[in-house]
A protein has these predicted regions:
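Short Gly/Ser/Thr- and Asp/Glu-enriched loop/turn motifs at secondary-structure junctions
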Residues: 92-95
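Acidic, Ala/Val/Gly-enriched low-complexity intrinsically disordered segments
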Residues: 2-3
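Non-heme Fe(II)/2-oxoglutarate
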Residues: 6-90, 100, 108, 133
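Catalytic core of non-heme Fe(II) oxygenases with the double-stranded beta-helix
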Residues: 99-174
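Short beta-strand His + acidic residue motifs that chelate non-heme Fe in jelly-roll/DSBH
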Residues: 109-112, 181-188
Length: 192
């Protein structure tokens, strides 16, 4: 067998397959300051014995102060649901929610996923350059064995084994719940 390689000046069309995604939008809340204050109280009041090792206490989605936020995230979930071609016979709802700050929380520091959902979202009502990034891990765990760092000139969706997303004020990030992710507070310079 003989392989012939031709050098061409035209660019190939590269089509990703088995796509993963993150969707990003800004959410402006009329009651953002109240949500932030209420969230800080929830963190300090949390009565879960092992708060730091098990994650945060799940919040009541029907809490009146959270209504606008829950409604907007559900709208985002359903827009995403429609855009990726899921059945119009089904709707997405927020089934659980919790609040984190920039402090040490081993539950979000370890790579994890949310196996009970289809989509997950992270909303930052406050953020600054000191916030730790949200890190997503490529589900193709062979990536780092194939593309050694010395081979990569520009990191992109085809050659990266992880992606860091820097939080922005009012930003909401939607992603598939099966996508492994974490927040390394070692990288954080603030508690936002």
């Amino acid at each position: 067998m003989v392989a012939i390689f031709l050098k061409t000046k035209t660019r190939m069309n590269i089509n990703p397959i088995f796509s993963r995604f993150v969707a990003v939008e800004n959410i402006d809340l009329k009651n953002k300051d109240e949500v932030v204050s209420w969230s800080k109280e929830e963190i300090s009041f949390d009565d879960t014995k092992n708060y730091k090792s098990t994650g945060t206490n799940h919040l009541n989605r029907d809490e009146p102060i959270l209504k606008e936020l829950v409604d907007k995230i559900e709208l985002g979930f359903n827009n995403l649901h429609n855009q990726i071609g899921l059945s119009s016979e089904h709707k997405q709802i927020v089934s659980s929610l919790w609040v984190n700050d920039g402090s040490n929380n081993t539950a979000i520091e370890a790579p994890h996923r949310h196996v009970d959902g289809i989509f997950s979202a992270v909303y930052w009502p406050i953020a600054d350059n000191g916030c730790a990034p949200l890190t997503f891990m490529n589900p193709n765990n062979q990536m780092s064995y194939v593309f050694k760092s010395k081979l990569i000139e520009v990191h992109n969706q085809f050659n990266s084994d992880m992606v860091n997303l820097q939080p922005q004020i009012n930003q909401c990030v939607y992603f598939p719940s099966w996508l492994w992710h974490y927040v390394s507070h070692v990288l954080s310079k603030t508690n936002n």
